[in-house]
Amino acid sequence: MKVNYNEIFKVKDSYQVPEKLMNILFNKEEREELFMELLRANDMNVDFDWFYEYFQDEHAERISKKQDFTPRCVADLLSKLVMNSEGDNGNYYECCAGTGGIMITHWNNFRRTYLPWDYKPQYHFAFVEELSDRSIPFLLLNMMIRGMNGIVIHGDTLTRKCYNAYFICNTKNDHFKFSGISVIPHTEYFEKELCVKFVSPDYKDHLELMELDDVFNLLNQ
């Protein structure tokens, strides 16, 4: 049965979802209620991007940003080719990540190389970039609901102009737990570390995860 995501997000029109979802992600209690509802609606299956068809039908910016989304079979093939040809240490990079479909496929294939009781979120770290305002909330949600670790750059991969950057971390290091989120400060230090130039005045001071020293250490791993 097709999931009615507008009903789950409690909106009348799909254009309202990105802004509302972004606000929910910064409220731990509210987002975890949403996460559980999404998990139940998708039979607890986190192997793929649930929003692939919904986002492509309702939110894709095909004219302005030439957005199209990678089919699951292609994402699976790409992931397996990389893992088989080069080995895989769990570090993942993707520009133009969209809502995270290829990233999720890689994460899923990677975690399945471990026994369920042996895998820990610290074994996989994703560094992903995306330009679209509409995609970013879904990309963040997809990482957080799966208990992933990583950094999300909201900006232009080519010019390195960056509107915001987000640190996603599973502080319990437990793949049955959700991840938290911090907005990375717009400072010269982080511009240098992330190779970006912050250009947006819309910085939201949200540092729920940990002390900055811990963030620095993770960035320098």
Which functions belong to the PLM regions below?
Residues 1-221:
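Class I S-adenosyl-L-methionine-dependent methyltransferase catalytic core
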